[in-house]
Amino acid sequence: MVTIRLSRGGAKKRPFYQIVVADSRCPRDGRFIERVGFFNPLAAGNAERLRIQLDRVNAWLEKGASLSDRVAALVKEAQKAA
């Protein structure tokens, strides 16, 4: 099953997440199909906190992909801001 989920990057104690489309059997930070955005939970000042390509997310959802709980909340937040 294809899932849209977070893949962790960044340094120790400084997380940065890529929003990726991946096979659910692959490791969290492993192989992915497509990168559709990013999430920076520690963004300060005028740094960008969240960017999602909503058109690509919707395309994958039409193909049968599922959203992780956290990504579903982030997509909802991005749609509200757009």
From Swiss-Prot:
InterPro entries hit by this protein: Ribosomal_bS16, Ribosomal_bS16_CS, Ribosomal_bS16_dom_sf
GO molecular function terms attached to this record: structural constituent of ribosome
Domain of life: Bacteria
Database matches in Pfam families: Ribosomal_S16
GO process terms (BP): translation
GO cellular component: cytoplasm; small ribosomal subunit
Keyword Magnesium in annotation: no
Keywords: Ribonucleoprotein, Ribosomal protein
NCBIfam families for this protein: S16
Family of this protein: Belongs to the bacterial ribosomal protein bS16 family.
PANTHER family, A to Z: 30S RIBOSOMAL PROTEIN S16, SMALL RIBOSOMAL SUBUNIT PROTEIN BS16M
Protein name, as recorded: Small ribosomal subunit protein bS16
Organism: Mannheimia succiniciproducens (strain KCTC 0769BP / MBEL55E)
